[in-house]
Amino acid sequence: MTKKLTIVKCPRCGTDVEWGEQSPHRPFCSKQCQMIDFGEWADEEKAIPGAPDMSDSDGWSEDQY
C-alpha cells in the first residue's frame, strides 16, 4: 500500500512542506518562519476578526445585554 504524501505551503514564505513527523515545525518550513509568525501574533499584527471588545468607554452597561 502506497502512503499518500501531503504537501502544504509554509504560511510565512510559501515553501513546500511535507505534512508529517519529518517536518517538526509544520505547517511552517522552519523554526525561523514559525517564530516570525508567532511574533506577529504576539505584537497583534495579526488577529482573528470578530466583534470589537466591549469596554466602559463604549457606553456598555449590563442592562443592554
Swiss-Prot record:
Residues 45-65 are annotated as: Disordered. It comes from the Bacteria. GO terms for biological process: regulation of DNA-templated transcription. One of its GO terms (molecular function) is zinc ion binding. The keyword Zinc applies. It holds the Pfam family YacG. Keywords: Metal-binding, Zinc. Residues 55-65 have a biased composition (Acidic residues). Its cofactor is Zn(2+). Zn(2+) binds at C10, C13, C29, C33. Binds 1 zinc ion. Inhibits all the catalytic activities of DNA gyrase by preventing its interaction with DNA. Acts by binding directly to the C-terminal domain of GyrB, which probably disrupts DNA binding by the gyrase. Interacts with GyrB. Belongs to the DNA gyrase inhibitor YacG family. This is DNA gyrase inhibitor YacG.
